[in-house]
Amino acid sequence: MAFDPVLMIMQPRQIDEAINSLKENIDIPKVWFRAYTEPQVMAQMNKFIRETNFSHYIVMSDDGVVSKEAADTILKYAEMDEYEVFTGWMNMHIEPDGNFSYISTVSQGYLPEILENEKGPMRNEYPPWLPIEWVISQEGMIRTKMANFAMSVAKREIFLELPLMTWPNGRSSDHNWSTRLQMMGIRVWTHRDAFIKHLRQGWTPWRHNWLVGKVTPQTIYEGKWRDREHYV
C-alpha cells in the first residue's frame, strides 16, 4: 500500500500558534478532534481508524508547534518500514523565564508496569528523561520508550492491534500506548531533526483557552491543500 498518512489532532484547547503551525507546514489530510475529553478523544480516534483506510495514522497533541523541518523529518522516516513507530520529540515544558526545560520527552528507560490497583503513572514512576542537549548531539536514529503524541506515527495495523486509551484516571494516554508498545516488543524511534516546540508551562496542565465543556465536541476533517491561502 502506498504511503498515505493522516494527521489526527487532539484539540481540548484553542492554541493558535500550534494550530497555525500544523496548517502551514503539513500538507496531508488532517482531522481535528475538538473539545473532547481525553477518554472521549481516544474513543473517537479509534473509531476514525476503524472506519477509514489510511496507510499510517499520526497522533498529535494540541500544544506543540511543528516546524516544516520536523514535519518533513517525521514523514520521511514514517514511510520507512524499518521504523515501526516514529515520533517527534519535545522540550518537556517551558520554564518561568521563557527558556526550554533542561530535559526532553525522550527516555530510554524501561516503563514500569502499572498495577491493577493503580489509576495511572505518577511523575516519579517515569524513567529518566534525557537532556535536550544530548538529543541534539545525536547524529543518527534514537530509540525512545515514549511515543509522546508529538506526531507519533504508525501503520494502521498497529493502531488496530493496540487501540488508543487512557489509564483509569482518564489521563496519560501516551504513556498507556507506549507501555503496551513496549510489552509487544514494538520499537519507537525519533531523530534530533524531529523536534517540536512544547508550549506547556511548567509541570501543571496549561489551562489556556480551554474548550472542553464549553463548546460542543466535534470531529472536523480537512483535506490536503487545494488553495493554500484557504488554510494559511
Language-model features, listed with the residues they occupy:
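Short beta-strand/turn micro-motifs composed of small residues
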Residues: 9-11, 60, 192
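A short acidic, amphipathic alpha-helical/loop segment
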Residues: 21, 44-47, 70-74
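Short beta-strand-to-loop acidic/aromatic patch adjacent to the donor-nucleotide binding site
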Residues: 55-65
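Short, high-confidence coil segments that cap the C-terminus of an alpha-helix
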Residues: 54, 82-84, 186
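N-proximal low-complexity "stem/linker" segments adjacent to membrane-targeting elements
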Residues: 1-33
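Conserved catalytic core of nucleotide-sugar-dependent glycosyltransferases
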Residues: 67-168
